[in-house]
Amino acid sequence: MADPAGTDEGEGTGCNGWFFVEAVVSRRTGDPVSEDENEDDCDRGEDMVDFINDTDILNIQAETETAQALFHAQEEQTHKEAVQVLKRKYASSPLSSVSLCVNNNISPRLKAICIENKNTAAKRRLFELPDSGYGNSEVEIQQIQQVEGHDTVEQCSMGSGDSITSSSDERHDETPTRDIIQILKCSNANAAMLAKFKELFGISFTELIRPFKSDKSTCTDWCVAAFGIAPSVAESLKTLIKPYCLYIHIQCLSCSWGMVILALLRFKCAKNRTTIEKLLSKLLCISAASMLIQPPKLRSTPAALYWFKTAMSNISEVDGETPEWIQRQTVLQHSFNDAIFDLSEMVQWAYDNDFIDDSDIAYKYAQLAETNSNACAFLKSNSQAKIVKDCATMCRHYKRAEKREMTMSQWIKRRCEKVDDDGDWRDIVRFLRYQQVDFVAFLSALKNFLHGVPKKNCILIYGAPNTGKSLFGMSLMHFLQGAIISYVNSKSHFWLQPLYDAKIAMLDDATSPCWAYIDQYLRNALDGNPISLDVKHKALVQLKCPPLLITSNINAGKDDRWPYLHSRVVVFTFHNEFPFDKNGNPVYGLNDKNWKSFFSRTWCRLNLHEEEDKENDGDAFPAFKCVSGQNTRTLRD
């Protein structure tokens, strides 16, 4: 048979072989027992401790414990790396803080030298990260900034025990310029200057100014607070800045920072904040960061009273005429005048200046607030939009009624009075002759046209393009303030509404569809007879159609498509192209001055006679007044 596995017949040392047992007999039976020996030792089995060999079992346990320790060490290393990544992501480096602190305090010049752009702006985070509880245990940064009356302390300490400290005794030996530089290093230099200003002057700087966000906004009046000025420079400021200003109000106080100046300046021309910063930095020898520059409050009575009262005291140096906005709010007479707003005065102003548009009235009247007490009261009102709308509405009513009361002769005379200069009527005559128009026939047609003679109420200027038809007609409409209608709006029911308020009207560049519309709907309008117009927000209005001037490239007076218009239009043909000189200017001046001269010269030929019955003042239509008159009280003996 085969030998059993693992058995070696030659030697008995295998696991299945024979064992050699050697017994050592230390004491035989019957030997006497010594007194020093303990009889119970044999019973404890101490001599059998190493009887069983457990070396292999201990080796296996050691290997298991080593593997567990290695796994634990690897897990601990992994966790440390994860925590370190989070610290690098959310916590600042202590070494960088230390280097920044050391550089800022030891070498400010080294701090100014930088090759790369450093963006120190704070990032906006959606959620605020909670404190992890892990601080900079190896290196600690402590920055203490204390701003008090005379002491300024900045401390930067590290965990190793090194520190850089500035004592109060050293601060007293430094110049005021150094003190103000240290103050400006605070996190909010503007707040520090505002606090120091209120401490010195007893009033907040923001109560005296109205802030301008843009540095490019211009203004003539500016309020300036400057800090850290040398005493000699502060005393000479009034003399240095006088050539640039119309009004100077300067207050000067001293503190631990140096001299502090509060100035109200009115410059000779409007300036922006950037220009003033450059000027004052040059005159006061300080940086722009140590100045507060804003325009003053112009409509604040407490602010005006502050400037008014301090100007009379001995703490201020004043030169020049007091600004009107201070006088208006401090002098008793101006206060009474600003109390009540009168709408009729505003309407009278708009009527006299021919303002009928809401925007023009609001803008122009607001500009009068500095000189007109009623305009100032208008700006103080909370219903400016309603006032402007009511003013424009009333002005249009007065203008419309006045125009209806005037005859054509009176209207032309009124328009001539609006033109100041006298022109040359010959330019218009030369232009008509250049276009081969009989001047006598034109005067006869113009006379019937202005008087609205039936069948002669419409003049057609016909000709090729670029012959000056529109220029001739538009210049006449501009002088007589006529209305313009356009066929492009013919789909609307109200496209003829401008005829409602017009003394004369014009339709430019009539085409075939336009002539077809006129032939179908406006024959009686060309006759000069009463027509019915659809006007917005009103019932149908009946009125006599004003004289109508039409320009066209189609001769409707001879076109067979519209035979009923042949007797209703008076046609003048322009044959030649409008001439210009080498500079591109018109050879013939068709403007208001020449039209004024033309009507003055042909006044009798056009049968434009004035009314014989005039008022007592010698004028058929005296100046319109919508304000109540002031009664004059006489003194009696």
UniProtKB/Swiss-Prot annotation:
Crosslink site: Glycyl lysine isopeptide (Lys-Gly) (interchain with G-Cter in SUMO): 544
Post-translational note: Phosphorylated.
EC number annotated for this UniProt entry: 5.6.2.4
Subcellular location per the Swiss-Prot or TrEMBL entry: Host nucleus
PROSITE patterns cross-referenced by the UniProt entry: SF3_HELICASE_1
Family: Belongs to the papillomaviridae E1 protein family.
Quaternary structure, from the entry: Can form hexamers. Interacts with E2 protein; this interaction increases E1 DNA binding specificity. Interacts with host DNA polymerase subunit POLA2. Interacts with host single stranded DNA-binding protein RPA1. Interacts with host TOP1; this interaction stimulates the enzymatic activity of TOP1.
Record protein name field: Replication protein E1
Gene: E1
